[in-house]
Regions:
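Alpha-helix C-terminal capping/helix-to-coil transition sites in glycosyltransferase folds
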Residues: 3, 12, 30-32
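A short, conserved acidic/glycine-rich loop-to-beta-strand motif
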Residues: 31-41
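Extended acidic/charged loop-beta regions that coordinate divalent cations
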Residues: 53-54
């Protein structure tokens, strides 16, 4: 809790990120964020036709296998030391809990966007296989 006097980098254990951490850290400090969440654009295709209905239940349209784009959390964060004081002792407490508590405290949270090609979540089987292929090519 009181062991850090500078912002720290926190990362999930199942991600690989190919991005300049110094740039992310500088962005965090320059913007004076209490938390910076590194985010990436990710496309998700629904493997079915998606039905859209009106408020009376009538079918308006069917969109076949649409692709949606979301800004997703990569699992890499920069934390200002003062947010660490919000973490309760001896209690299971997720990073999303901390983010919500920081928001409730009206502290500043920002997002640093990176390319979808810049990170892999090896906790996902398909991405793990892709990471293995890439790492074996070196």
């Amino acid at each position: 809790r009181n062991k850090f006097d500078k912002s720290i980098i926190l990362t999930n254990s199942d991600i690989l990120i190919n991005s300049d951490l110094a740039d992310i850290y500088t962005f965090h400090e320059k913007k004076k964020y209490d938390i910076t969440l590194v985010a990436s654009s990710k496309d998700f295709t629904i493997p079915y036709g998606v039905c859209q209905i009106d408020n009376k239940g009538y079918l308006k349209s069917v969109v076949e296998k649409p692709t949606y784009n979301f800004l997703v959390n990569t699992g890499l964060y920069i934390l200002n030391p003062k947010v660490l004081k919000l973490i309760p002792k001896n209690k299971l407490y997720d990073i999303t809990d901390l983010i919500m508590d920081v928001k409730k405290a009206k502290m500043k949270i920002g997002a640093y966007p990176i390319s979808d090609k810049s990170w892999i979540d090896v906790g996902q089987w398909t991405e793990y296989k892709e990471a293995t292929k890439k790492l074996n090519s070196y």
